[in-house]
């Protein structure tokens, strides 16, 4: 009887471990920013989820492929008069994807190099990256 309980316990622990590992699987997030069209598309595991208007830099936003370096939900710029940068996803030094109060300028270059989004879209993106992980997120800017 004791042996049966031991086997049952081992099976239960193995099943729990498999479910835990399966539940911990995170999705791959791809954020693509098209500077010529001032648009961002977001895909999760290869499935298109969102297309949003953005504002990139007037004098340029770095092009390339990046991974998020840090997240800051309520960030204020240390470079530009403490400008609010809600839902910041930093990807290249001081460059970030973040919400903006200048929503009327979305769709055209307007920033000093960052990628600006409508605050509600920035919140959705921030939560997605936070949930799925910075290591599972890739940002391409072209």
Regions of interest found by a model, annotated:
Residues 30-34:
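A short beta-strand micro-motif
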Residues 35-65, 127-128, 133:
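N-terminal targeting signals for Sec/Tat export/insertion, comprising classic cleavable signal peptides
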Residues 41-43, 69, 98:
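Beta-strand residues in well-ordered beta-sheet regions across diverse protein folds
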Residues 23, 69-71:
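Short Pro/Gly-enriched beta-strand edge/turn motifs at strand-loop
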Residues 11-20:
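Bacterial N-terminal signal peptides
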Residues 21-27:
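Sec/Tat signal peptide C-region and signal peptidase I cleavage site
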Residues 28, 60-65, 72-142:
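Exported/periplasmic cell-wall-interacting domains
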Residues 1-12:
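Bacterial N-terminal signal peptides that target proteins for export
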């Amino acid at each position: 009887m004791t042996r049966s309980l031991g086997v049952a316990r081992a099976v239960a622990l193995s099943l729990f471990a498999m479910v835990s590992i399966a539940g911990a699987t995170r999705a791959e997030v791809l954020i693509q920013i098209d500077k010529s069209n001032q648009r961002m598309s977001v895909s999760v595991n290869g499935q298109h989820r969102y297309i949003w208007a953005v504002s990139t830099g007037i004098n340029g936003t770095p092009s390339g492929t990046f991974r998020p370096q840090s997240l800051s939900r309520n960030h204020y710029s240390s470079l530009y008069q403490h400008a609010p940068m809600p839902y910041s996803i930093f990807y290249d030094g001081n460059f970030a994807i973040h919400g903006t109060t200048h929503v009327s300028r979305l769709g055209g270059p307007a920033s000093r190099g960052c990628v600006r989004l409508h605050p509600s879209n920035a919140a959705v993106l921030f939560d997605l990256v936070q949930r799925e992980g910075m290591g599972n997120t890739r940002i391409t800017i072209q």
